C-alpha cells in the first residue's frame, strides 16, 4: 500500500477544484398536519424513472434531489439551492419534511413507487419490496444526505498513489472518525411516538407525541433508525479491493437464516443473502 503525502493532500484539499462533488438529498413529503403524505409523485417532475434531478427513493413520499457533479463548491451550492426551491414550488400542497426521522405515520404501509416493466425497473421494485419485507416501512422512512466525491486523475498522480488505495484509505479514515462526525453534525435526537410504537427501547418522553434519547445526536444511525442487526453482525474491511469484493459476494450469495424465511418463489425479495445486491 502506497503512503500518501499528508502535506500535499492538505494543499490539494485547500483548493475546491481538485475534486468533483455532488449531493443526493432525501426528504419525505408531508402534509400540512405533519403526517407522511400519501400523494403520488408530483406531475411537474415527470416520470421519476427518467428524471435525473428529482426522483424517488424507497417510497412515493420519499423524494430525492440529485445534483450533477461540480468542481466549484459555490456552483454546487447554487445548483442545489435552485433545484430545492423549484421542488418546493411544485409539491402540490405538500411540504418537505426537514428531519432525518420521519413525521407521524398514517397507516401500516407507505406506498412503493411504480417502476415500469423493464428488467431494470422490475429489479428496482423487487429490491425495495425486499427491504419492506426484511425491515418494515418504518426503517425505510428515515432520510439522509449523500455527499459524493471523487478526485481528478492529476491529483491521484501527484499524490503518488492509486485510485483504489486512495478511496480505500478515505473509507478507513471516515470510519475511524465516524463517532466524531456524528457528535459534531448529527441532528436527529427526536422521533415521533408512532415511529417507535411497539418497540422495546429505553427512550424518554419529550412531549406527548415525541420521544428523544438524552445527549443523542443522531437517532437515524442508531439502533432506532436505519439499522440492521443482521448486517451489523457482519464485518466489512477496506484493506484491499479483493478482500472487500469477496466479503460483499459472500454476503449476497450465502443464505441468511432469518431472510431465508421470506419467500423467494413469491418474489418478495431479490435473494436471501444478508444483502440483496451490491
Which residues does each predicted region cover?
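Loop-rich catalytic cores of soluble enzymes, especially ATP-dependent carboxylate-amine ligases
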Residues: 105, 116-134, 141, 150-278
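Terminal catalytic/cofactor-binding subdomain
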Residues: 1-132, 139-145, 165-172, 179
